[in-house]
């Protein structure tokens, strides 16, 4: 991956919180955790050079999503090298969803966003997922159809970049592929490399 710059972990923590603050599923927990930590301004007007703010954001992410060793982050490696850049279309196509039942089933078992639309069209979803609803995939894709940029997915990878797994940004990446927008949009991302990433339960 060319053109990626080194990034600091506080950037990634902020990007994760920003990505989920308006989430239908996780937004309430994230906003509550931010308010308890210091306030929504931790995301809305961050000072990434402030150690106090960075600690507060980590505290909020821990409360909302388990950073950095529980819930979503169970088994997450301590040592991660972070980078930031733009994912090219062929790189986007290599990114898989996390190993979680919802995303596994939505993609027909492959964990690949490119398989979501064929799975939806074929009606191959289990009843429990159908009840949750899938119209959001098309609604979000329609919203992105007028966009030019999608900001800051968070992708985890082995050091050789042989395996790429999405940590944050599942709805955005799904909508990109459902809308066939992967070759039109500019998609930025944080990329985390770790020799121990395969111990993460969702990898």
Question: Which residue ranges define each predicted feature?
Answer:
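Short alpha-helix boundary/capping and kink motifs at helix termini
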Residues: 36, 40-46, 52-88, 93-167
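Intrinsically disordered, low-structural-confidence terminal and linker regions
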Residues: 1-47
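Short, flexible beta-strand-to-coil junctions
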Residues: 1, 154-163, 191-196
């Amino acid at each position: 991956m060319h053109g990626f710059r080194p990034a600091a972990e506080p950037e990634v923590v902020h990007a994760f919180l920003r990505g989920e603050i308006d989430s239908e599923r996780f937004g309430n927990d994230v906003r509550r955790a931010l308010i308890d930590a210091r306030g929504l301004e931790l995301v809305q007007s961050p000072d990434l050079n402030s150690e106090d703010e960075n600690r507060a954001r980590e505290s909020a992410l821990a409360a909302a999503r388990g950073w950095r060793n529980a819930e979503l982050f169970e088994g997450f490696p301590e040592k991660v090298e972070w980078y930031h850049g733009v994912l090219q279309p062929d790189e986007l196509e290599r990114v898989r969803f996390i190993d979680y039942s919802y995303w596994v089933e939505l993609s027909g078992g492959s964990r690949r966003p490119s398989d979501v639309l064929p799975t939806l069209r074929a009606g191959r979803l289990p009843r429990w997922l159908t009840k949750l609803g899938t119209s959001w995939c098309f609604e979000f894709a329609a919203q992105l159809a007028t966009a030019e940029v999608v900001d800051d997915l968070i992708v985890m990878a082995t050091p050789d970049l042989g395996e790429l797994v999405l940590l944050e940004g599942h709805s955005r990446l799904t909508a990109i592929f459902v809308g066939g927008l992967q070759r039109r949009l500019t998609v930025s991302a944080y990329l985390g490399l770790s020799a121990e990433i395969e111990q993460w339960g969702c990898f």
